[in-house]
Amino acid sequence: MIENKSLGSKIFDVLNVVFLVIVMLICIMPVWYVLCVSLSSREAVNAGKVAFWPVGFNLLSYQKILGEGEFFGSFLISIKRVVLGTAVSMVCVLMAAFPLSRTKKQFPHKEIFMWILVFCMLFNGGTVPWYITMRNYHLMDSIWGLVLGTGLQVFNVILAVNFFKNLPSELEEACFIDGGGPWRNLISICIPLAKPMVATIALFTMVMYWNEFFQGMVLSTRQSSYPLQTYIQQMVVTLDYSTMNVEQIAQAMKLNNLSLDSAKIFIAMIPVLIVYPFLQRYFVDGITLGSVKG
């Protein structure tokens, strides 16, 4: 039987659709505008003519960025950083979160360790001690310096702890009855059930490693060691005409800094836009994970 909606319900549905469309446009338009600016001519950008489509279409900004020989090396460094960093971070997060999610009987004084982690999240030693530590461990100009510098995110640990706490205790008891221990409980039961949480934290970590550029500036003494974000930032900020020939200088004069920045931003978004659709279904699973099932 189809229930007829009241006038108030129909009005609500219409307003809800209008609101969601507005939110969608608010999210999409900045990305579209950045793309339009990156594809527009210098004159059009300076005159403020770019709005909803490129004006004076050209690919000079992307040619400038992609034409540098170091670009692909920096791109490869960023890919390695994301892959290694996400793997290391997920291992650290899961290894820290699982014991902290156990009961007091299983892990006495766990509150002390949790408060230590929270304290380190709120207060840190500062950039200079961190730099000295990384230098003393010979992690300058090393991919491991870019990975281990932010290997453990306390916020992600807290998310994982809360997720593990909500798993049914009967599953752990059944594992122990079958002769399993903590390792089997973690690997065979908790992690498979925590796929939505693992995917969410992995996406957060990947985005963090991909977008982070400050550590590359601090830990890299050579341009060949720059991750992609640091390389693009340095290229845009420090445009060195002394190393260019006449043709390159003429090309640079046709560019606008805003166009270069827009191209940089759009290139930085591409990997995330590619990865997100593959992880989206885990977000849906995470939303319905705690629902009542009949």
Show the residue positions of the predicted features.
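A hydrophobic, multi-pass inner-membrane permease signature
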Residues: 2-294
